[in-house]
Amino acid sequence: TDAIDWVKTLKGAEGLSKIVEKGKSSFVGHEISGKTLGVIGLGAIGVNVANAAVGLGMNVLGYDPYLSIDGALHLDTQVKTSDLDMLLKTADFITVHVPFTPSTANMFNADTFAKMKDGAVLINNSRGELVDNAAVVAAVESGKLERYITDFPADQLIGVKNIICVPHLGA
């Protein structure tokens, strides 16, 4: 959002394209090619995310103890299966695509964050209840997690630096 706000300030500026070219380096994010994405949950959405990440040049690890035959058949052959601990330890980015059940409640907690690679980014577009909010705030504030992105805003998360909350737009 900082980049969007910055561009809005440029309205009417002379030499706009030169200003944009010069200033855009302030907003450069991660180069994802060659980085490792961990996909937790390989249902229809998880498979699509994993396959897209392969297409973007990422190394992809997938974890799903309930992977269906259909899911496996649609999964790119470059996606490697992993156990959860190895995925947490290895992935630069982790995206979660599992349902909320009693066994997935707070699956991301202080113990889980301790197993994760330092500086990892966690993306949760599944359910808010999968993540212990106090633990994720602590992990982000300590630098253990570089960033947490979710579409389940909670009061405890809104306004915390390096936590991005957007509205849930699930179909």
Label each PLM-derived region with a short phrase:
Residues 158-171:
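Adenosine-phosphate binding glycine-rich loop
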Residues 40, 63:
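The conserved SAM/SAH-binding core of class I Rossmann-like methyltransferase domains
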Residues 52-53, 116:
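Aromatic pocket-lining residues of Rossmann-like dinucleotide-binding sites
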Residues 46-47:
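N-terminal Rossmann-fold NAD(P) dinucleotide-binding loop
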